[in-house]
Amino acid sequence: MALCLWLFLVLPICCWCQGAVDLGDSGVFQPQSALTDMEFASVSTYRGPGNTDPRPNKELPILLWWSSNLFPHFPGDTERVDCAHSSCLVTSNRKVQLYRRTASIIFYGTDFRAYEAPLPRLPHQTWALFHEESPMNNYLLSHSVGIRLFNYTATFRRESDYPLTLQWLPSLDYLLAPTAISLQEKNHWRQAGLAPVLYMQSHCDVPSDRDRFVQELMKYIEIDSYGKCLNNKPLPEYLEDTSTATSEDRRFMSFVARYKFHLALENGLCPDYMTEKLWRPMHQGCVPIYRGSTTVADWLPNNHSAILVEDFSTPRELADFIKALDQDDVEYLRYLKYKTPSEITNLRLLEGLESREWGVNDMSKPNYLNGFECFVCDKENERLAARKAHRKNPKQNQPPQPKMANSSHMGCPLPSPGYGPVENVEPNDSWLQMWPQDYWQSLDQAEGLESLIRHNVSEPSLLWQHIQSIAVRRARGLSNDSR
């Protein structure tokens, strides 16, 4: 048992095949009252073509959704899911945490808190992470010691087990939609006084520090800024309730489509993190000026469909390029060629949209929450079957192989200033005081939680004590035994 706990350091599910799993056999680990109703959970109407699972509910493995704010079923807190190859019971009832049939706990990344983690972590349980949102929501997951706590992942990174990279792109047709406003009309609005560039943002203090970049860019080119951030122009009264730029209200979309260029600046910088800020301008037939994912070029329709901030050495150089493009209709229209199907030449994009098993507003496919849930269900049934076979005949059947996430499943870099080196940022700057500190404090919490798990602690409130102990060891020049 001690060996199993120690190996959580590098193989958090190394004890899949060990006798420690029998911890769940004693009565204290079987809160039967919580399971009484679960045995009679409703049966889903869909069963995958490869699913011939004959087991009744009382024999199925249980998946526990840990977040109190997220359970992708309605109504109730328990459901039977019949997936592509196998079936599970899924629940949000935390009373089953220590039950021996609870095979995996699914966490929603934004809500995951080290000081609320389900401890002790049982050797027979896996942890699954679903995190489709910004890296800024939980930097604990961007550190290697944090992401290694999970066995299955669904994130915006293509390297995750269940990638959500194109979650903000509903379909190929979304890109191919006709240009909302013709170039001739856009030029008319330019002559009427609109700036060439639109900035629509009301979430100001973010890790990417985009406002600092926009402030510098404004020195060299005219930008109409309608949101709360760097506002220099009021929205029409009929659009005031859409000032956060998250709405696809028809009138709002028509208004912003007048602009030839849209500043598309993500709130966090991380490979493969791309949101509606990129895809919406392209849907409308506007040219995005993009800063966010460092790998965005891997997913664009072709090599001439967006202006990438990182391709320019200075904001002034970028401004000069935009000004020239604003005056050249032929060159500008080259950026919209992807509106013709044959001009979408990026096979990775085409294959990514075609092969993803989940859909966006597509009734023929599951949403990505239920899709990931079934992914975990099938993987857990595979693991449990392999463990059973190994126990029955160890010589003939290999034990299930431990699986652990790594930094490529999420890892995002330390936030950096939107413009200029960090040394040029004033010490009392709100961005400097917030986001770099949050990034490193999240590392402290990740190391603290890993220490709690490794020491088989059952009380998450002891997190701060473990963090302090790690800090003291580091200050004394001792190695950190959590790594």
Curated annotation (Swiss-Prot):
**Listed Pfam families:** Glyco_tran_10_N, Glyco_transf_10
Determine if Membrane is one of this entry's keywords: yes
Cytoplasmic compartment residues: 1
The glycosylation sites annotated in the UniProt record are 151, 303, 406, 428, 456, 480
Q: What EC class is this?
A: transferase
The terms describing its cellular component in GO are: endoplasmic reticulum; endoplasmic reticulum membrane; Golgi membrane
Superkingdom field: Eukaryota
Region Disordered, residue ranges: 387-425
Mind listing the GO biological process terms from this record? Answer: fucosylation; positive regulation of protein secretion
User: How does the protein's chain sit in the membrane according to the entry?
Assistant: Single-pass type II membrane protein
- Give the Lumenal membrane side ranges: 22-483
Spell out the subcellular localization from the entry. Answer: Endoplasmic reticulum membrane
Q: Which family does it belong to?
A: Belongs to the glycosyltransferase 10 family.
Name of this protein: GDP-fucose protein O-fucosyltransferase 4
Taxon lineage: Eukaryota, Metazoa, Chordata, Craniata, Vertebrata
Instruction: Name the gene that codes for it.
Output: fut11
